[in-house]
Protein backbone atom coordinates (compact mmCIF):
# COMPACT_ATOMS: atom_id res chain seq x y z
CA UNK A 1 0.00 0.00 0.00
CA UNK A 2 1.24 3.47 -0.86
CA UNK A 3 1.26 5.88 2.07
CA UNK A 4 2.43 9.45 2.70
CA UNK A 5 4.40 10.03 5.91
CA UNK A 6 6.79 12.64 7.37
CA UNK A 7 10.40 12.32 6.27
CA UNK A 8 12.87 10.53 8.57
CA UNK A 9 16.65 10.67 8.91
CA UNK A 10 16.93 7.18 7.42
CA UNK A 11 15.38 8.44 4.15
CA UNK A 12 18.49 10.35 3.06
CA UNK A 13 19.81 7.59 0.78
CA UNK A 14 16.41 7.23 -0.90
CA UNK A 15 16.25 10.99 -1.42
CA UNK A 16 19.72 10.94 -2.96
CA UNK A 17 18.49 8.33 -5.44
CA UNK A 18 15.48 10.48 -6.29
CA UNK A 19 17.66 13.58 -6.67
CA UNK A 20 19.85 11.75 -9.18
CA UNK A 21 16.80 11.26 -11.44
CA UNK A 22 15.38 14.79 -11.48
CA UNK A 23 17.55 16.41 -14.14
CA UNK A 24 18.21 20.15 -14.01
CA UNK A 25 15.66 22.64 -12.77
CA UNK A 26 14.31 21.08 -9.56
CA UNK A 27 16.26 23.50 -7.40
CA UNK A 28 15.06 22.24 -4.02
CA UNK A 29 16.15 18.62 -4.56
CA UNK A 30 19.90 18.78 -5.31
CA UNK A 31 21.98 15.60 -5.44
CA UNK A 32 23.97 16.72 -2.41
CA UNK A 33 23.82 14.55 0.70
CA UNK A 34 24.77 17.30 3.15
CA UNK A 35 22.03 19.58 1.80
CA UNK A 36 19.41 16.82 1.88
CA UNK A 37 20.41 15.80 5.41
CA UNK A 38 20.10 19.41 6.54
CA UNK A 39 16.68 19.62 4.89
CA UNK A 40 15.55 16.52 6.77
CA UNK A 41 16.83 17.95 10.07
CA UNK A 42 15.00 21.22 9.42
CA UNK A 43 11.77 19.30 8.79
CA UNK A 44 12.18 17.28 11.98
CA UNK A 45 12.84 20.46 13.99
CA UNK A 46 9.76 22.04 12.40
CA UNK A 47 7.59 19.18 13.65
CA UNK A 48 9.22 19.45 17.06
CA UNK A 49 8.41 23.17 17.26
CA UNK A 50 12.04 24.26 17.53
CA UNK A 51 12.21 26.74 14.63
CA UNK A 52 10.82 30.23 14.00
CA UNK A 53 8.22 30.50 11.24
CA UNK A 54 10.78 31.93 8.82
CA UNK A 55 12.73 28.66 8.90
CA UNK A 56 9.91 26.12 9.08
CA UNK A 57 9.45 23.56 6.33
CA UNK A 58 7.69 20.19 6.19
CA UNK A 59 8.94 17.30 4.05
CA UNK A 60 6.90 14.19 3.25
CA UNK A 61 7.75 11.00 1.40
CA UNK A 62 5.68 8.44 -0.48
CA UNK A 63 6.42 4.94 0.80
CA UNK A 64 5.40 1.46 -0.29
CA UNK A 65 4.41 0.07 3.11
CA UNK A 66 5.09 -3.52 2.00
CA UNK A 67 8.65 -3.05 0.72
CA UNK A 68 9.78 0.19 2.37
CA UNK A 69 10.62 1.68 -1.04
CA UNK A 70 10.48 5.50 -1.13
CA UNK A 71 9.73 6.60 -4.72
CA UNK A 72 8.48 10.13 -4.09
CA UNK A 73 8.92 13.35 -2.12
CA UNK A 74 6.91 16.53 -1.58
CA UNK A 75 7.27 19.48 0.77
CA UNK A 76 5.75 22.69 2.12
CA UNK A 77 7.66 25.82 3.10
CA UNK A 78 5.67 27.64 5.77
CA UNK A 79 6.64 31.23 4.87
CA UNK A 80 9.06 32.08 2.06
CA UNK A 81 11.33 35.08 1.90
CA UNK A 82 11.45 36.02 5.58
CA UNK A 83 15.16 35.18 5.91
CA UNK A 84 16.50 35.24 2.34
CA UNK A 85 14.65 37.34 -0.26
CA UNK A 86 12.31 35.27 -2.45
CA UNK A 87 12.63 36.55 -5.99
CA UNK A 88 10.58 36.18 -9.11
CA UNK A 89 9.75 38.30 -12.12
CA UNK A 90 6.36 39.90 -12.55
CA UNK A 91 5.42 39.98 -16.22
CA UNK A 92 3.91 43.43 -16.67
CA UNK A 93 3.52 46.09 -19.32
CA UNK A 94 5.19 49.42 -20.04
CA UNK A 95 3.54 51.73 -22.55
CA UNK A 96 5.54 54.06 -24.79
CA UNK A 97 3.37 56.44 -26.77
CA UNK A 98 3.59 59.65 -28.77
CA UNK A 99 0.44 61.36 -30.06
CA UNK A 100 2.57 63.64 -32.19
CA UNK A 101 4.11 60.69 -34.04
CA UNK A 102 0.98 58.53 -33.76
CA UNK A 103 2.98 55.78 -32.07
CA UNK A 104 1.67 53.55 -29.30
CA UNK A 105 3.65 50.55 -28.04
CA UNK A 106 2.63 48.35 -25.10
CA UNK A 107 5.74 46.35 -24.28
CA UNK A 108 5.81 43.19 -22.13
CA UNK A 109 8.31 43.85 -19.35
CA UNK A 110 9.89 41.84 -16.53
CA UNK A 111 9.95 43.50 -13.11
CA UNK A 112 12.01 41.97 -10.28
CA UNK A 113 9.60 41.18 -7.46
CA UNK A 114 9.41 40.03 -3.84
CA UNK A 115 5.59 40.12 -3.90
CA UNK A 116 5.15 36.59 -2.53
CA UNK A 117 7.15 37.21 0.63
CA UNK A 118 5.49 35.43 3.55
CA UNK A 119 3.43 33.05 1.40
CA UNK A 120 3.39 29.32 2.07
CA UNK A 121 4.98 27.35 -0.76
CA UNK A 122 4.34 23.92 -2.23
CA UNK A 123 7.71 22.62 -3.38
CA UNK A 124 10.06 19.68 -3.99
CA UNK A 125 7.48 17.50 -5.72
CA UNK A 126 9.12 14.55 -7.46
CA UNK A 127 7.93 11.04 -8.22
CA UNK A 128 10.21 8.36 -9.66
CA UNK A 129 9.15 7.87 -13.31
CA UNK A 130 8.72 4.13 -12.73
CA UNK A 131 6.06 4.86 -10.11
CA UNK A 132 3.95 7.33 -12.09
CA UNK A 133 0.86 5.13 -12.10
CA UNK A 134 -2.20 4.11 -10.07
CA UNK A 135 -2.79 7.59 -8.66
CA UNK A 136 0.59 7.89 -6.95
CA UNK A 137 1.12 11.38 -8.37
CA UNK A 138 -2.23 12.61 -7.10
CA UNK A 139 -1.59 11.12 -3.67
CA UNK A 140 1.86 12.69 -3.47
CA UNK A 141 0.83 16.17 -4.60
CA UNK A 142 -2.54 16.50 -2.85
CA UNK A 143 -1.49 14.96 0.46
CA UNK A 144 -0.08 18.38 1.35
CA UNK A 145 -3.55 19.90 1.17
CA UNK A 146 -4.81 17.36 3.70
CA UNK A 147 -2.01 18.41 6.07
CA UNK A 148 -2.76 22.09 5.53
CA UNK A 149 -6.47 21.53 6.11
CA UNK A 150 -5.81 19.65 9.35
CA UNK A 151 -3.30 22.18 10.67
CA UNK A 152 -4.55 25.37 9.02
CA UNK A 153 -3.08 27.65 11.71
CA UNK A 154 0.45 26.61 10.71
CA UNK A 155 0.18 28.24 7.27
CA UNK A 156 -0.39 31.63 5.71
CA UNK A 157 -3.34 32.82 3.64
CA UNK A 158 -1.68 32.52 0.24
CA UNK A 159 -0.07 29.40 -1.20
CA UNK A 160 2.33 29.50 -4.16
CA UNK A 161 4.04 26.86 -6.26
CA UNK A 162 6.94 27.41 -8.65
CA UNK A 163 6.67 25.18 -11.70
CA UNK A 164 9.80 23.94 -13.45
CA UNK A 165 10.33 25.85 -16.70
CA UNK A 166 11.48 24.66 -20.11
CA UNK A 167 14.90 22.96 -19.94
CA UNK A 168 16.14 20.30 -22.33
CA UNK A 169 17.82 16.99 -21.45
CA UNK A 170 21.24 18.65 -21.68
CA UNK A 171 20.38 21.33 -19.11
CA UNK A 172 19.85 24.06 -21.71
CA UNK A 173 17.35 26.73 -20.66
CA UNK A 174 16.41 29.25 -23.38
CA UNK A 175 15.31 31.80 -20.77
CA UNK A 176 18.52 31.49 -18.77
CA UNK A 177 20.67 31.57 -21.88
CA UNK A 178 19.10 34.80 -23.08
CA UNK A 179 18.83 36.60 -19.73
CA UNK A 180 20.32 35.07 -16.59
CA UNK A 181 23.62 34.00 -18.08
CA UNK A 182 24.38 37.58 -19.13
CA UNK A 183 24.32 38.70 -15.50
CA UNK A 184 25.53 35.60 -13.64
CA UNK A 185 28.22 34.42 -16.09
CA UNK A 186 27.61 30.74 -15.33
CA UNK A 187 25.65 27.84 -16.79
CA UNK A 188 22.08 27.22 -15.68
CA UNK A 189 22.98 23.97 -13.92
CA UNK A 190 25.63 25.74 -11.81
CA UNK A 191 23.29 28.54 -10.74
CA UNK A 192 20.54 26.02 -10.01
CA UNK A 193 22.88 23.91 -7.86
CA UNK A 194 24.15 26.92 -5.88
CA UNK A 195 20.60 28.02 -5.18
CA UNK A 196 19.53 24.49 -4.22
CA UNK A 197 22.39 24.10 -1.74
CA UNK A 198 21.52 27.35 0.03
CA UNK A 199 24.20 29.57 -1.52
CA UNK A 200 21.78 32.31 -2.56
CA UNK A 201 23.72 35.49 -1.82
CA UNK A 202 24.85 35.68 -5.45
CA UNK A 203 21.24 36.24 -6.57
CA UNK A 204 20.88 39.53 -4.71
CA UNK A 205 24.38 40.58 -5.73
CA UNK A 206 24.07 39.89 -9.45
CA UNK A 207 20.37 40.17 -10.34
CA UNK A 208 19.43 42.92 -12.79
CA UNK A 209 17.65 45.60 -10.76
CA UNK A 210 15.92 47.41 -13.63
CA UNK A 211 12.88 46.36 -15.69
CA UNK A 212 13.70 44.22 -18.72
CA UNK A 213 11.80 44.44 -22.01
CA UNK A 214 11.07 40.89 -23.12
CA UNK A 215 11.54 41.97 -26.75
CA UNK A 216 15.26 42.23 -25.96
CA UNK A 217 15.34 38.49 -25.27
CA UNK A 218 15.66 35.86 -27.98
CA UNK A 219 12.41 34.69 -29.53
CA UNK A 220 13.09 31.24 -28.06
CA UNK A 221 13.32 32.77 -24.58
CA UNK A 222 10.17 34.84 -25.07
CA UNK A 223 8.26 31.72 -26.14
CA UNK A 224 8.99 29.84 -22.89
CA UNK A 225 7.98 32.60 -20.46
CA UNK A 226 5.33 31.10 -18.19
CA UNK A 227 5.63 27.66 -19.82
CA UNK A 228 6.44 24.41 -17.99
CA UNK A 229 8.83 21.52 -18.57
CA UNK A 230 6.96 18.67 -20.35
CA UNK A 231 7.35 16.43 -17.29
CA UNK A 232 5.86 19.19 -15.13
CA UNK A 233 2.70 19.66 -17.20
CA UNK A 234 0.74 17.01 -15.22
CA UNK A 235 1.70 18.64 -11.91
CA UNK A 236 0.53 22.01 -13.21
CA UNK A 237 -2.79 20.50 -14.30
CA UNK A 238 -3.29 18.96 -10.85
CA UNK A 239 -2.80 22.32 -9.14
CA UNK A 240 -5.00 24.19 -11.60
CA UNK A 241 -7.84 21.74 -10.94
CA UNK A 242 -7.44 22.58 -7.25
CA UNK A 243 -7.88 26.30 -7.96
CA UNK A 244 -4.32 27.52 -8.53
CA UNK A 245 -3.76 30.11 -11.24
CA UNK A 246 -0.88 31.73 -13.09
CA UNK A 247 -0.88 35.44 -12.21
CA UNK A 248 2.02 36.57 -14.40
CA UNK A 249 4.86 35.72 -12.03
CA UNK A 250 7.74 33.61 -13.31
CA UNK A 251 10.93 32.00 -12.03
CA UNK A 252 14.04 34.17 -12.35
CA UNK A 253 16.15 31.27 -13.65
CA UNK A 254 14.09 29.27 -16.15
CA UNK A 255 11.01 31.47 -16.70
CA UNK A 256 8.61 28.79 -15.42
CA UNK A 257 5.25 29.96 -14.04
CA UNK A 258 4.48 30.60 -10.38
CA UNK A 259 0.96 29.43 -9.55
CA UNK A 260 -0.94 30.79 -6.57
CA UNK A 261 -4.19 30.38 -4.66
CA UNK A 262 -5.76 31.60 -1.43
CA UNK A 263 -5.37 28.67 0.94
CA UNK A 264 -9.05 28.56 1.90
CA UNK A 265 -10.07 28.42 -1.77
CA UNK A 266 -8.03 25.29 -2.55
CA UNK A 267 -10.63 22.67 -3.51
CA UNK A 268 -9.20 19.79 -1.45
CA UNK A 269 -8.85 22.00 1.63
CA UNK A 270 -12.28 23.58 1.24
CA UNK A 271 -14.15 20.34 0.57
CA UNK A 272 -12.34 17.97 2.93
CA UNK A 273 -14.26 16.95 6.05
CA UNK A 274 -13.90 14.76 9.11
CA UNK A 275 -15.67 11.40 9.33
CA UNK A 276 -15.60 8.55 11.81
CA UNK A 277 -13.71 5.45 10.75
CA UNK A 278 -14.62 1.82 11.40
CA UNK A 279 -12.91 -1.47 10.64
CA UNK A 280 -14.50 -3.87 8.20
CA UNK A 281 -14.75 -4.84 4.57
CA UNK A 282 -15.43 -1.77 2.40
CA UNK A 283 -18.60 -1.96 0.33
CA UNK A 284 -18.17 -3.04 -3.27
CA UNK A 285 -19.11 -0.58 -5.97
CA UNK A 286 -17.85 1.89 -8.51
CA UNK A 287 -16.68 4.43 -5.96
CA UNK A 288 -14.22 7.25 -6.73
CA UNK A 289 -10.70 7.41 -5.34
CA UNK A 290 -10.51 9.54 -2.21
CA UNK A 291 -7.71 10.92 -0.07
CA UNK A 292 -7.93 9.72 3.51
CA UNK A 293 -5.68 11.29 6.18
CA UNK A 294 -5.34 11.03 9.92
CA UNK A 295 -5.26 14.11 12.16
CA UNK A 296 -2.03 13.18 13.94
CA UNK A 297 0.45 16.05 13.59
CA UNK A 298 3.59 14.09 14.46
CA UNK A 299 2.57 10.83 12.77
CA UNK A 300 0.64 12.21 9.80
CA UNK A 301 -0.42 9.66 7.18
CA UNK A 302 -2.40 9.78 3.91
CA UNK A 303 -3.61 6.96 1.66
CA UNK A 304 -5.91 6.60 -1.33
CA UNK A 305 -9.09 4.59 -0.86
CA UNK A 306 -12.13 3.93 -3.05
CA UNK A 307 -15.21 4.94 -1.12
CA UNK A 308 -18.35 7.06 -1.12
CA UNK A 309 -17.04 10.61 -0.55
CA UNK A 310 -20.34 11.58 1.09
CA UNK A 311 -20.23 8.84 3.73
CA UNK A 312 -20.52 9.73 7.41
CA UNK A 313 -18.86 6.50 8.55
CA UNK A 314 -15.84 5.32 6.59
CA UNK A 315 -15.21 1.58 6.52
CA UNK A 316 -11.53 0.68 6.11
CA UNK A 317 -9.67 -2.62 6.22
CA UNK A 318 -7.31 -3.46 9.06
CA UNK A 319 -4.39 -2.89 6.69
CA UNK A 320 -5.64 0.59 5.76
CA UNK A 321 -6.19 1.50 9.40
CA UNK A 322 -2.70 0.29 10.22
CA UNK A 323 -1.20 2.33 7.37
CA UNK A 324 -3.04 5.41 8.67
CA UNK A 325 -2.07 4.65 12.28
CA UNK A 326 -5.75 4.85 13.18
CA UNK A 327 -8.21 2.82 15.23
CA UNK A 328 -11.93 2.25 14.90
CA UNK A 329 -13.77 5.28 16.25
CA UNK A 330 -11.08 7.78 15.27
CA UNK A 331 -11.92 10.66 12.97
CA UNK A 332 -10.13 10.97 9.64
CA UNK A 333 -10.13 13.62 6.95
CA UNK A 334 -11.75 12.65 3.63
CA UNK A 335 -11.98 14.25 0.19
CA UNK A 336 -12.39 12.77 -3.26
CA UNK A 337 -10.00 13.36 -6.12
CA UNK A 338 -11.29 15.56 -8.94
CA UNK A 339 -13.79 13.66 -11.09
CA UNK A 340 -11.47 13.47 -14.10
CA UNK A 341 -8.48 12.22 -12.09
CA UNK A 342 -8.26 8.48 -12.65
CA UNK A 343 -6.12 6.08 -10.63
CA UNK A 344 -6.30 3.02 -12.86
Swiss-Prot record:
It catalyses: succinyl-CoA + L-arginine = N(2)-succinyl-L-arginine + CoA + H(+). The active site is at 229 (proton donor). One of its GO terms (molecular function) is arginine N-succinyltransferase activity. The keyword Acyltransferase applies. It holds the Pfam family AstA. InterPro entries: Acyl_CoA_acyltransferase, Arg_succinylTrfase_AstA/AruG, Arginine_N-succinylTrfase. It is an enzyme of class 2 (transferase). Its EC number is 2.3.1.109. One of its GO terms (biological process) is arginine catabolic process to succinate. Pathway: Amino-acid degradation; L-arginine degradation via AST pathway; L-glutamate and succinate from L-arginine: step 1/5. The keyword Acyltransferase applies. Succinyl-CoA binds at residue 125. Keywords: Acyltransferase, Arginine metabolism, Transferase. Belongs to the arginine N-succinyltransferase family. Catalyzes the transfer of succinyl-CoA to arginine to produce N(2)-succinylarginine. PANTHER family: ARGININE N-SUCCINYLTRANSFERASE (PTHR30420:SF1), N-SUCCINYLARGININE DIHYDROLASE (PTHR30420). This is Arginine N-succinyltransferase. The lineage of its organism: Bacteria, Pseudomonadati, Pseudomonadota, Gammaproteobacteria, Enterobacterales.
Amino acid sequence: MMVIRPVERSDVSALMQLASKTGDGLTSLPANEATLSARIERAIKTWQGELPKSEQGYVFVLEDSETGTVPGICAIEVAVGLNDPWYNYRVGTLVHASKELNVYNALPTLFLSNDHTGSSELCTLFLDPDWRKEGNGYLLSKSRFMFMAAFRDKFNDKVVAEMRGVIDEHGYSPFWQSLGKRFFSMDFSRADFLCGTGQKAFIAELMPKHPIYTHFLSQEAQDVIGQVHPQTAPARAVLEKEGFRYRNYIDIFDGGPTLECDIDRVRAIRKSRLVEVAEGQPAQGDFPACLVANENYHHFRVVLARTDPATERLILTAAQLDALKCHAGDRVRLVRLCAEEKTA
